Curated annotation (Swiss-Prot):
Source species: Nocardia farcinica (strain IFM 10152)
Name of the molecule in the record: Acetaldehyde dehydrogenase 3
GO molecular function: acetaldehyde dehydrogenase (acetylating) activity; NAD binding
Catalytic activity from the UniProt record: acetaldehyde + NAD(+) + CoA = acetyl-CoA + NADH + H(+)
TM spans (from-to): none
InterPro entries reported in the protein's UniProt record: Acetaldehyde_dehydrogenase, Acetylaldehyde_DH_C, NAD(P)-bd_dom_sf, Semialdehyde_DH_NAD-bd
Signal peptide: none
Binding site for NAD(+): 17-20, 166-174, 298
Leading EC class: oxidoreductase
Length: 328
C-alpha cells in the first residue's frame, strides 16, 4: 500500500477509467512507495474503474479533465497519467500542460518524446509530456534496441498479438495510431533504419496470453557479432523482466542467414550496410492480474512501464520549487 498523505510522495492522477487506467491505479496503490493516488478521472459515472477508485478511497470525477481541474486537491497533483485515446490526449494536454503538470501519455498520441524504460528511461526526465508508445512497443522495442546496439538493423518488424478481451474501446479506436506510433518508435528508440508494426486482436476463448514476435534484418556476418546479439537480447529480456515479471522469451533466439536470392532490399531502408542475417525473437508477456486476468500482459507491460518512468522522475518532481511548475 502506498503512503497516504506522506509529504515525501508525489501525488498523481489517472485520466481514463478503462482497463489501462484502472490497472495503473491499482499498481500505484499496491506497489508504489513514492507515488500516491490523488484522483481517478473518467467520463462514465457508471464505469467499473471509477467504482473501484471510490471503494479504494481515491477522489473521483466523471466530468473528464474539467472535473479534475475542479477537484479540491488538484493543485497538489504533480504527475498525470493519460490513459484515454490519442485524440482525447491532445485536448487534455492543451488544458494541463500550461498548468505545469507533468504528463505521462499512455495513448498513441505521441506529442512528446518516446520513453521505453529499459532503453531510455534517463533521457527525458525533464520533458513536460512523454509518450509510452504502445503495449506492443514496450514489449518489442527493447529487443530491437538490444540488436541495434550490437549490429546495424536495416529493418525491424514487430507483431503484437493480444487477447481481444483485453482491448477496450480506447485501444480499438486507436488501432491505426498504434501501428504508426509503434513503427516510428521502433526506428527512433529501437534504432532500426526502417520499422513496421502489426497488431492482432485474438478472439480465442479462453483468452491467450500476449505474444510478441520481433524480426530484425541485421548486418552480422561475423559469428562473434551473432553471439554478442544473443547475449545482448538475453540481458535486455532480464532488464525488462525487472519491472514486468511476466516478460520472457517463449523460444530460443533464432539467427539465420538471409539467402542470396531473398529480396530484402524491398524491406530495408536505403543506405547503410546490407543485412546478412534475420534475428527472430518470440516473446510472451504474462500479466500480474492486478485488474484483468493474467492473459492481459499488454495492460501489465504498459502500466508497469509508465509506473517505472513516473517513479524515476518522482525525486525530480518533489525537488522542484512549486513556483516553477509552469516551466518544468
Amino acid at each position: 500500500m502506498n503512503h497516504m498523505s506522506d509529504p515525501t510522495t508525489v501525488k498523481v492522477a489517472v485520466i481514463g477509467s478503462g482497463n489501462i487506467g484502472t490497472d495503473l491505479m491499482i499498481k500505484v496503490i499496491r506497489h508504489s512507495r513514492v507515488l500516491e493516488m490523488g484522483a481517478m478521472v473518467g467520463i462514465d459515472p457508471d464505469s467499473d474503474g471509477l467504482a473501484r477508485a471510490r471503494r479504494l478511497g481515491v477522489p473521483t470525477t466523471s466530468d473528464g479533465v474539467e472535473g479534475l481541474l475542479a477537484l479540491p486537491g488538484f493543485a497538489d497533483i504533480e504527475v498525470i497519467f493519460d490513459a484515454t485515446s490519442a485524440k482525447a490526449h491532445a485536448a487534455n494536454a492543451a488544458l494541463l500542460q500550461p498548468l505545469g503538470k507533468r504528463l505521462i501519455d499512455l495513448t498513441p498520441a505521441a506529442l512528446g518524446p518516446f520513453v521505453v524504460p529499459a532503453v531510455n528511461v534517463d533521457e527525458h526526465r525533464d520533458a513536460p509530456n512523454v509518450n509510452m508508445v504502445t503495449c506492443g512497443g514496450q514489449a518489442t522495442i527493447p529487443i530491437v534496441a538490444a540488436v541495434s546496439r550490437v549490429a546495424p538493423v536495416a529493418y525491424a518488424e514487430i507483431v503484437a498479438s493480444i487477447a481481444s478481451k483485453s482491448a477496450g474501446p480506447g485501444t480499438r479506436a486507436n488501432i491505426d495510431e498504434f501501428t504508426e506510433t509503434t513503427a516510428h518508435a521502433v526506428e527512433t528508440v529501437g534504432g532500426a533504419r526502417r520499422g513496421k508494426a502489426i497488431i492482432i486482436l485474438n478472439p480465442a476463448e479462453p483468452p491467450l496470453i500476449m505474444r510478441d514476435t520481433v524480426l530484425c534484418l541485421a548486418t552480422a556476418p561475423d559469428p562473434a557479432t551473432r553471439s554478442a546479439i544473443r547475449e545482448s537480447i538475453e540481458e535486455m529480456v532480464a532488464r525488462v523482466a525487472g519491472y514486468v515479471p511476466g516478460y520472457r522469451l517463449k523460444q530460443q533466439i533464432q539467427i539465420t542467414e538471409i539467402p542470396p536470392d531473398q529480396p530484402v532490399h524491398t524491406l530495408a531502408a536505403d543506405g547503410g550496410p546490407a543485412p546478412t542475417h534475420q534475428v527472430s525473437v518470440f516473446l510472451e508477456v504474462e500479466g500480474a492480474a492486478h485488474y484483468l486476468p493474467s492473459y492481459a500482459g499488454n495492460l501489465d507491460i504498459m502500466t508497469s512501464a509508465a509506473l517505472r518512468y513516473a517513479e524515476s522522475i518522482a525525486a525530480t518532481v518533489t525537488a522542484a520549487p512549486a513556483d516553477q511548475g509552469a516551466t518544468r
